[in-house]
C-alpha cells in the first residue's frame, strides 16, 4: 500500500522529535524485530524521499464519516479527518465560536485556500499538522460526545494531555489554554475526489509550512 497510514482514532502522546523513534522502540520492546522494517517502510516513504520533502499521496476512499487517519509527511504527523454534517454544523455554531481564541484564522497558520470557517479545501475533509502549538506534543483526537476525560457536552476536537490545550475539529485553539495558535494546515491538494497529495499546493497557489507562526 503506497499510502502512509499510521493510525485511526486516538493518537498517542509523543513529542514531535520522537514520533518515529518511539514507534520503532515500541516494536522492538515486544520482540517483533523481524516486523520492524516492513512496518517502518509502510509508515513513511524512503529516507531520500523524506529528506527531499517529497509529497505524500493519501487514498481517502477507506475513511468513513467521523473517522480520522494519520499519515507522516516530513516527519510530522498529519491528521486527515472526514467530518460529518453534524460536526460541520458545530464548527459554525456560535457556541463553538465563542470558545475559540482565533475563530477566523487571522493568524498565519494555514494557506489562503484554507483560511475559511472549516480551514480546508473541502468542508468534509480536514487536513492538519497534529502537533500542539504550545510545546510540540501530539494531542489526542476526541470525537464529539461525552467522555470521562472531556466530560459531557464536548463538541469534538483535540485535547493535549501535556498541559491541557484544546482545539476544535477545524484545529482552532480554545481560549484560556497554553497553546497560542491554531493547529497548522499543511500544503495539500486534491488529485481526485478520493485522493489528496500532502506537500503540494493547488495550481496557482503558493504556501510553505515553514512560513507559519508556529508548528
For the regions a language model picked out, list residue spans one by one.
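Aromatic-capped interface at the extracytoplasmic side
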Residues: 35-55
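N-terminal secretory signal peptides
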Residues: 1-14
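Extracytoplasmic/periplasmic/luminal assembly and interaction segments
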Residues: 66-114
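Membrane-cytosol interface motif
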Residues: 52-65
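Rieske [2Fe-2S] iron-sulfur-binding domain
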Residues: 96-207, 211-215
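Short sequence/structural segments immediately N-terminal
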Residues: 16, 22, 49-52
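N-terminal export signals
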Residues: 2-3, 18-41
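Residue-level detector of beta-strand structural context in well-folded domains
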Residues: 56, 67-69, 186
Amino acid at each position: 500500500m503506497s499510502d502512509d497510514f499510521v493510525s485511526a482514532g486516538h493518537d498517542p502522546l509523543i513529542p514531535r522529535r520522537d514520533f518515529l523513534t518511539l514507534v520503532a522502540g515500541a516494536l522492538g520492546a515486544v520482540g517483533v524485530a523481524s516486523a520492524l522494517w516492513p512496518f517502518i517502510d509502510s509508515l513513511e516513504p524512503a529516507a531520500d524521499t523524506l529528506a527531499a520533502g517529497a509529497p505524500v499521496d493519501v487514498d481517502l476512499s477507506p475513511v468513513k464519516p467521523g473517522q480520522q487517519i494519520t499519515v507522516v509527511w516530513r516527519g510530522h504527523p498529519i491528521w486527515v479527518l472526514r467530518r460529518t454534517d453534524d460536526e460541520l454544523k458545530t464548527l459554525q455554531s456560535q457556541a463553538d465560536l465563542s470558545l475559540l481564541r482565533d475563530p477566523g484564522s487571522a493568524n498565519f497558520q494555514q494557506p489562503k485556500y484554507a483560511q475559511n470557517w472549516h480551514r480546508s479545501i473541502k468542508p468534509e475533509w480536514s487536513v492538519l499538522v497534529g502537533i500542539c502549538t504550545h510545546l510540540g506534543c501530539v494531542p489526542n483526537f476526541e470525537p464529539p460526545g461525552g467522555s470521562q476525560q472531556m466530560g459531557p457536552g464536548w463538541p469534538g476536537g483535540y485535547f493535549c494531555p501535556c498541559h491541557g490545550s484544546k482545539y476544535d475539529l477545524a484545529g482552532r485553539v480554545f481560549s484560556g489554554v497554553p497553546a497560542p495558535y491554531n493547529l497548522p494546515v499543511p500544503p495539500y491538494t486534491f488529485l481526485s475526489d478520493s485522493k489528496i497529495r500532502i506537500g503540494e499546493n493547488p495550481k496557482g497557489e503558493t504556501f510553505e509550512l515553514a512560513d507559519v507562526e508556529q508548528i
